[in-house]
Amino acid sequence: MPKAPKTKLHHAPLYKDIAESSESGVLRQKPSKQKKSKESNTGNGFLDAKTSKKILQLAREQKEELDEEENGKPSQISAFISNGHQKDTLENPAIESSYEESEHARNVSDSESITSQEEEEYEELEIDDADRDLFDRFLPTVSGEEGDLTEEKTTSLSDLIMQKINEAEARARGEYIPSAEEEENALPPLPPKVIEVYSKVGVLLSKYRSGKIPKAFKIIPTLSNWEDILYLTRPDMWTPHACYEATRIFISNLKPVQAQHFLTVIILERVRDDIRENKKLNYHLYMALKKALYKPSSWFKGFLFPLVQENCTLREAAIIGSILQKVSVPVLHSAAALLRLTEFDLSGATSVFIRILLDKKYALPYKVLDSLVFYFMRWKSLERPLAVLEHQSMLVFAQRYKFDITPEQKDALLEVVRLKGHYSIGPEIRRELLNSASRGEEIPVEMEY
């Protein structure tokens, strides 16, 4: 059946246009644009009850703010900020509204909270002799000669947090008696309202799964006494999801020394406790450590070195080493970390981290290579048998840097292999050392004609 012809034409026929143009001189007239719109009410409009209620509430809040400004009565938190506790402005309504907003957003899907990846920036790592004293305040230290370990009394994370909270409450009541050193660097006591707000933030973080973080928590890195306020949130009660968000916020906003202290006091003990209880590391804590490598200097000084000093287990070394293996670390930071690891006691965990850093195949300075040779030479003084992980670290060193060590160093390593060698790995190390040129020697090149 043929298609029905269209009855309505989009434009006039050509002969009509020509006839009209001969009369008016215009070939075609531009069609007028007529806007089609719905019929609008010409009378007075009415608002529903819900909209009227919102307008009245906003007007009431604005009137209260204007009254407070005219009376000149700032809130306790704003007065606390004016004393030098905060760089930016913070008002009570902002904290409370952010807390309520985070309560409503708690059930949002957390699929978007972990996928964001920031552009990585790295800072220089400076190794000095004072690094060992970094952890003496809260963690045990290792002293004495090799094999003689003297552990001091440790302070757990929960005890430290409760101590800080009790001090803050005592300061608010005026019952705290500071020491002479604290009086010199004393800050004004925390207002009761600040303690109350951040205690509520801590309750929220103890149940946090996904959603927005309270704004009152996000501004903590900008405060001069950020550590005291952070303890009010009870970091030992945080969920792993909250630990990830906190690490992301603090690592990106704190200075390297402060970020190093945050990793040592908060994250290190939390990670070790989780591995000890579950025999594996929670995914969000794992991602928090990866995010902390945003500042490798703070990560090595504040997390890895204290972990190795505190008798790191092979399970912990395998888990943390996988993070170090997946993330790219700058050459200077890797070289400085290797130099420091060779100064620690001989252990399987230390060998795991050394092997992972050597497997990155960076061009290391001769000073680092010499320290690695001396580290392997210390094996001769051990009475215990070496683990396979330790033999593997020496094999990786021989494979990657056999052309960068001297003949004398090769002879010393061969002597170590003869005394402490593995039945299957030892011959591989010997083959790599013997069938290679040494430092400063020319590599013969076979010419084919």
Curated annotation (Swiss-Prot):
Q: What is any one GO biological process for this UniProt entry? A: endonucleolytic cleavage in ITS1 to separate SSU-rRNA from 5.8S rRNA and LSU-rRNA from tricistronic rRNA transcript (SSU-rRNA, 5.8S rRNA, LSU-rRNA)
| Phosphoprotein keyword on record | yes
- Source organism, top-level taxon: Eukaryota
According to the record, the residues making up region (Disordered) are 1-125
Which key words are in the record?
Answer: Phosphoprotein
Where on the chain is Phosphoserine found, per UniProt?
S22, S156
Which GO-annotated molecular functions does the record name? snoRNA binding
Bias class Basic residues marks the residues at 1-13
An example Gene Ontology CC term for this record: preribosome, small subunit precursor
Which InterPro entries would you find in this protein's record?
Answer: Bystin
Does the UniProt entry include the keyword Phosphoprotein? yes
**Polar residues: which segments have biased composition?**
73-84
Concerning its family, UniProt says: Belongs to the bystin family.
Q: What is this protein called?
A: Uncharacterized protein C13G1.09
What is the originating organism of this protein?
Schizosaccharomyces pombe (strain 972 / ATCC 24843) (Fission yeast)
